[in-house]
Amino acid sequence: MPNLIILVFVGGAFGAMCREFIMLSVPRLADGFPMDIFVANIIAAFLLGLTTSFFKKDKINQYVHLMVGTGIMGGLSTFSSFVFGAVEMMKNPTEVLVSICYLVASLIVGFIAVELGLMIGPKEKPKDPQVASE
């Protein structure tokens, strides 16, 4: 059990460093749209879908899934910053519409990113009907 926690911890630290790199590299747009947080969350959503697909098809073991899926993707994505950014934008009456667009776009594009990750990952092999009937 402690080894699993260490894997998540190390993955989370690496994911947080990746998030900080993205936040330093991706500029905020002039209208206040937090593109840096949006990009980090969408990348994490896609990679979590992909990692989960590999895990479900037994292409990676539980240790890799915990370190990458829970640790790295958990450290990379940032729900608290997502919500905080939206709340801060809503304090400015001229940015309310941008804030709503940010929230909706994050959910829709995040959903699509997870689905793409799952679709790109390994596919389940169809079960052999003769094996099932024996």
UniProtKB/Swiss-Prot annotation:
The keyword Ribosomal protein does not apply. One of its GO terms (molecular function) is metal ion binding. It is found in: Cell inner membrane. InterPro entries: FluC. The chain crosses the membrane at residues 4-24, 35-55, 67-87, 100-120. GO terms for cellular component: plasma membrane. Signal peptide: none annotated. The keyword Metal-binding applies. Na(+) binds at G74, S77. Keywords: Cell inner membrane, Cell membrane, Ion channel, Ion transport, Membrane, Metal-binding, Sodium, Transmembrane, Transmembrane helix, Transport. It is a multi-pass membrane protein. GO terms for biological process: cellular detoxification of fluoride; fluoride transmembrane transport. Belongs to the fluoride channel Fluc/FEX (TC 1.A.43) family. HAMAP family: FluC. Fluoride-specific ion channel. Important for reducing fluoride concentration in the cell, thus reducing its toxicity. This is Fluoride-specific ion channel FluC 2. It comes from Yersinia pestis.
